[in-house]
Amino acid sequence: MALAPLFLAGCRNDEPDAAGPTPDSSTDGTATDGATSGGSQAGTGDLLAAHGLEGMDTREIIEHLEALTLDERPQDLMASVRPSQLLMSDAEGRELALPIEGDFYLSTAPFVEGTHECWFHSLTTCRGELAEVEVEVRVADASTGEVIHEGTERTHPNGFFGLWLPRGGSYEMTCTVDGATYTTAISTATEDDATCLTTMQLT
């Protein structure tokens, strides 16, 4: 096939128990004020303001960080997407857990030759092979076959594209690039479900 991989780098936040702020069981729509275990007692706004994220809600923060060019990605900020929370920490010891309400965020990096293991997506460190490539994406309910998403997505400079999917479901997702395709099962039903998909090898 004609695809040429641009680069491949690992994801430092690839395990279900990866280091980062402790998940907060409260998802009432407000950010946690103060640090979680191990962090300094900094208010919510301090971390966000320090990284140019003040005034954004959780969804906007995720989409903003996902879309940054590689040069723009902060080296001193970790942002881990969990099924119900965005866990953030920085080099100053500030930690923050923001609730993700409504739809489930899944970030996907199709690949041809090389990939890396990942489970919970790291918005600032995860990199996939195919950057800024158009991908035909189809997501259907695994039980009924109902198509819930179909269209063209473009991978960001980090090689990933993100989808907001209905929470609580089981789906089949197909990705196609230049005639090469892959189909896999995905789930948005539990707190253990992956938010990072790096196993779709296009053939």
Predicted regions and their residues:
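N-terminal export leaders
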Residues: 1-2
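C-terminal motif of bacterial Sec signal peptides marking the signal peptidase cleavage site
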Residues: 7-10
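N-terminal low-complexity, Pro/Thr-rich disordered segments
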Residues: 13-54
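Extracellular beta-sheet/turn segments enriched in Thr/Pro/Gly and aliphatic residues
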Residues: 96-98, 104-111, 190-203
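Mid-length scaffold segments of soluble, non-membrane domains
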Residues: 99-148
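Short, acidic Ser/Thr/Gly-rich low-complexity loop/linker segments typical of extracellular
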Residues: 144-158
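Glycine-centered loop-to-beta-strand initiation motif
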Residues: 155-163, 169, 173
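A short, solvent-exposed loop/turn motif at the edges and junctions
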Residues: 175-184
